[in-house]
Amino acid sequence: VPKVSDGSLIHIIQIAEGCLGACTFCCTRFARGPLNSYPIKDIVAEAKKAIDDGAVEIQLTAQDTAAFGYDSGEKLSDLIKEVANLDGEFRVRVGMMHPKNILNNVDEIIDAIKHPKVYNFIHLPVQTGSNKVLSEMRRGHTLDQYLDIVSKFKSEIPDLTLAVDIIVGYPTESDEDFQLTVDLLRNIKPSLIHLSKYQHRKGAVSSSLKEIPHEVMKKRSRNLSRIKTEITEEENKELVGSVQNAVVVEVGSKGGF
């Protein structure tokens, strides 16, 4: 059921409920149930109403936007284009995509995100740079497949903003596995890195595993936080002196934008 717009500049639309994943560290599929994608026509109608009411940013969100349409036969790429083609001055932001669910249609999604009204942004969680740990997490893809997706996006969208998720200290993560994660981040240089320390979740498969020592986890987290800062500073320095377009979505805490 479309939500009633409250006149906010940012309007968030949930495009699906549920998940197709089987990640060992997660309980989403238990809490949210099987995938249920909402009809494109309903999502577009909600977006149009929000834009008419003054929204300048439409956020398409789900537990995994890349799974959209796997149950209904519709496509995420078609949804993005239909929303972006609405009249008005606004931008579309696409939420988190599980890598395994865009392997077969990455070119179509890239084409949709290249639309001038869509942010050059993807949130593509990888969690680890180790193939061994990826397999133990049951992520459903390899590191090479992930790198291929990132490479395709960056070759087609040179100014891409890449956001990634990393879990620090998964129970089976060795020092060598952690170093592979460090190597991955230095290689792909994501604009945004969301770090989280592993913790057991009730009902998750991985909760039966022995956690690594807390001090080891903290040390690895500090290491990645430092790398995160280095990558951000390097990217920001490259923007010095450039002119960028911006969308104003809120008033700052000190009265600015």
Write out the residue ranges for each language-model feature.
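Conserved alpha-helical substructure of the radical SAM core
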Residues: F30-Q59
